[in-house]
């Protein structure tokens, strides 16, 4: 028993730099299903403006789609190449840009527009705008 443990330890040490892929990718037979899901997800985000809900989270969005959270995470990572927060914040930044150019929202400060777009804090808004556009929020107005 000790010899097996010793041998396994040596094998592990010898292969410590080998990358072992552990993440499942969307298989070819799943691709049509994921195309449909991505279309439904875009419709929900654009049509119902779910991103404007500051309490939107992975669980509530996956429930809205009728899929388990892990499947939504896989869809976002593989199809959109984004994590959940980046995906939602991209919609929020686009909404904030649209609102900042709308005369009906001219009376709001940038922070007010951020809250209208679904952001919870100024810091998150600033960080997301910089990440999505490469500009600061003030440069957007």
Locate the predicted segments by residue.
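Alpha-helical membrane-embedded segments
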Residues: 1-11
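Membrane-proximal linker segments that couple transmembrane helices to downstream signaling/catalytic modules
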Residues: 10-117, 124, 128-131, 135-139
């Amino acid at each position: 028993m000790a010899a097996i443990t010793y041998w396994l330890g040596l094998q592990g040490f010898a292969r410590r730099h080998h990358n072992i892929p552990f993440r499942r990718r969307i298989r070819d037979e799943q691709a049509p299903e994921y195309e449909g899901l991505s279309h439904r997800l875009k419709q929900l985000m654009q049509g119902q403006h779910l991103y404007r809900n500051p309490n939107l989270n992975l669980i509530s969005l996956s429930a809205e789609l009728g899929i388990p959270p892990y499947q939504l995470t896989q869809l976002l990572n593989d199809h959109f190449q984004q994590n959940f927060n980046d995906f939602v914040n991209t919609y929020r930044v686009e909404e904030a840009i649209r609102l900042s150019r709308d005369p009906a929202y001219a009376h709001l400060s940038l922070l007010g527009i951020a809250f209208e777009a679904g952001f919870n804090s100024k810091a998150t808004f600033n960080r997301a705008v910089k990440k999505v556009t490469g500009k600061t929020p003030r440069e957007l107005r």
